[in-house]
């Protein structure tokens, strides 16, 4: 019988990789808590109409990439392709906007899009996102960008660039849309097939085409910054000034429009040159009309989402290592020693140590070889003689230094050992 494998476009995250995910999630949680953001969790599937109204029926996501199905009640449901629409739906449904003030929220979880799988692009992928709802202040745009910058810097990532643009308000976009269509129409036959389809349906997305000839044509296309009204221009100027005040470098990119219809004013991406076609690690912008489009009160908002698979791929590409190693590797052999080793391991864990207990039952020699491979700085050796005397052998694996001490003394010295373990790790880095 043939084995069953993971579906195309999905992948298992194995223990040697999960340490990256845990580090990213822990770092993000710490940064977001310090900025007074609260976590929200929404369902993985929603009514299809939510995404059709929120993202836009003319987008590639809604038109080509959503996983949509009918349930047994003949209701059309869709696995979420992104997180913002669900967050807004939740706030409207639970009347959280009635509380007034500014809502600062963050989320993380799996998203689903039917795309051609490749490195950094899966059909099930994970996003970490933030949303600030209730503030039209340009400082809110700068704040969410600053938080993303903090996360990338805290993770020790380099070689990324913040790309910035404004897509204006609805009136600005309409003027620019017409100017872009007027410019591109004479070149229609030279555009790639996807761009030809988008010309009258969603022309701004043509600016994001990866086709070489289409990119050449777009080089001389009108720039949206020249079509901004005074209000939009002032907003964008203040965002840029705030980023300058914060010391966050950026580049203006007039072709940056993002792929979702709900964006207004500020649009931004954190891009890298190290992941080939999957250059965007984090993307976001302002979406002042989305809440009203989904039936809520007039509420300005801004946010971003990070693709965690791409972020972790970048960490690995830059050889940034996060290793999960035990503090102690506990070796035991003997009828008296083995049950006692389990008790000792639990006591050490209760003292806050990471303890790996060898459960193989193999000879001491084989267990000690596994201890060497574990990466633990300390090995505890417990035979029947030590167990009967309530002692244990403590061995520093790097130096071979070894001593015998009572199990009580071992626990009493926990603070000292914790400091020595920390020192041993710092010496390696």
Curated annotation (Swiss-Prot):
<keyword id="KW-0030">Aminoacyl-tRNA synthetase</keyword>
<dbReference type="GO" id="GO:0005524">
    <property type="term" value="F:ATP binding"/>
</dbReference>
<dbReference type="Pfam" id="PF03129">
    <property type="entry name" value="HGTP_anticodon"/>
</dbReference>
<keyword id="KW-0963">Cytoplasm</keyword>
<keyword id="KW-0067">ATP-binding</keyword>
<dbReference type="InterPro" id="IPR004154">
    <property type="entry name" value="Anticodon-bd"/>
</dbReference>
<dbReference type="InterPro" id="IPR041715">
    <property type="entry name" value="HisRS-like_core"/>
</dbReference>
<dbReference type="InterPro" id="IPR015807">
    <property type="entry name" value="His-tRNA-ligase"/>
</dbReference>
<keyword id="KW-0648">Protein biosynthesis</keyword>
<keyword id="KW-0547">Nucleotide-binding</keyword>
<keyword id="KW-0436">Ligase</keyword>
<dbReference type="GO" id="GO:0004821">
    <property type="term" value="F:histidine-tRNA ligase activity"/>
</dbReference>
<dbReference type="Pfam" id="PF13393">
    <property type="entry name" value="tRNA-synt_His"/>
</dbReference>
<protein>
    <recommendedName>
        <fullName>Histidine--tRNA ligase</fullName>
        <ecNumber>6.1.1.21</ecNumber>
    </recommendedName>
</protein>
<dbReference type="InterPro" id="IPR033656">
    <property type="entry name" value="HisRS_anticodon"/>
</dbReference>
<dbReference type="InterPro" id="IPR006195">
    <property type="entry name" value="aa-tRNA-synth_II"/>
</dbReference>
<dbReference type="InterPro" id="IPR004516">
    <property type="entry name" value="HisRS/HisZ"/>
</dbReference>
<comment type="subunit">
    <text>Homodimer.</text>
</comment>
<comment type="similarity">
    <text>Belongs to the class-II aminoacyl-tRNA synthetase family.</text>
</comment>
<dbReference type="GO" id="GO:0006427">
    <property type="term" value="P:histidyl-tRNA aminoacylation"/>
</dbReference>
<dbReference type="InterPro" id="IPR036621">
    <property type="entry name" value="Anticodon-bd_dom_sf"/>
</dbReference>
<dbReference type="InterPro" id="IPR045864">
    <property type="entry name" value="aa-tRNA-synth_II/BPL/LPL"/>
</dbReference>
<dbReference type="GO" id="GO:0005737">
    <property type="term" value="C:cytoplasm"/>
</dbReference>
